[in-house]
Amino acid sequence: MTITEIRNLLQGEVSSEQLEELRADERKGVQKLLISYEKRQAKRAQAVAQFQDRFSYEKKFWQKSQLVAGVDEVGRGPLAGPVVTAAVILPHNFDLIDVNDSKKLSPKKRKELFPKILAKAVSVSVGLANNDVIDRINIYEADRLAMAHAVQGLKVKPDALLVDAMNVPLNIPQVKLIHGDAKSNSIAAASIVAKVFRDNLMDAYGEVYPEYDFKHNAGYGTREHMEALKKYGPTPIHRRSFAPVSEYEK
């Protein structure tokens, strides 16, 4: 085979017999390709092992034939827009190994995984609390309320919840995990769903209020956002209970 043919071969599944033949090929170009291939395989094997480790909490419930939902939120810190939460129930055979804490993934990867999670999950639900609710009951309680709405919106009722660092105000057994989106695939999937949903929502608000650059800042207090607040005052989606916003109320 030519070097190009071997390069193409190593992009897919390779049998042990083929690998033995390539290892016996003394061409430097072939050996370089083999080294790169083996590094990729080792990296993938590590990713698969870590992915399986992130099912350790789920397996405790699966062993008892129980359904468990991962719950996470995004948007506690922004000055504008809602806090968005998601609840996700994953099947035992869930195999999207790239699913991880949404903060560790690029926007492109999150958007790529979003529809795949929706397609493979047993059930997915989104809950949100808008700025009026946040201003009325505070961000922490609004977050908990939105989480409850997300869980209640699931088409299948879970037997238990895995929650990222919060307690959901529902009478369902739950495990609170600090940095849960890095420890549980169910929470990680929920973090991706919530993040992409909120980003899409803030993109839409960016069309309505272009001066505030919501498409790029998602409601966070960037320099451009603060300059627009100073010049134009708050929009109907701003959180007036947040100090920087109230200072620019006209």
Swiss-Prot record:
One of its GO terms (cellular component) is cytoplasm. Gene3D superfamilies: Ribonuclease H-like superfamily/Ribonuclease H (3.30.420.10). GO terms for biological process: DNA replication, removal of RNA primer; mismatch repair. Manganese or magnesium. Binds 1 divalent metal ion per monomer in the absence of substrate. May bind a second metal ion after substrate binding. It comes from the Bacteria. Its cofactor is Mn(2+); Mg(2+). CDD domains: RNase_HII_bacteria_HII_like (cd07182). It is found in: Cytoplasm. One of its GO terms (molecular function) is RNA-DNA hybrid ribonuclease activity. Its EC number is 3.1.26.4. It catalyses: Endonucleolytic cleavage to 5'-phosphomonoester. PANTHER family: RIBONUCLEASE H2 SUBUNIT A (PTHR10954), RIBONUCLEASE HII (PTHR10954:SF18). NCBIfam families: PRK00015.1-1, PRK00015.1-3. Belongs to the RNase HII family. This is Ribonuclease HII. It comes from Lactobacillus gasseri (strain ATCC 33323 / DSM 20243 / BCRC 14619 / CIP 102991 / JCM 1131 / KCTC 3163 / NCIMB 11718 / NCTC 13722 / AM63).
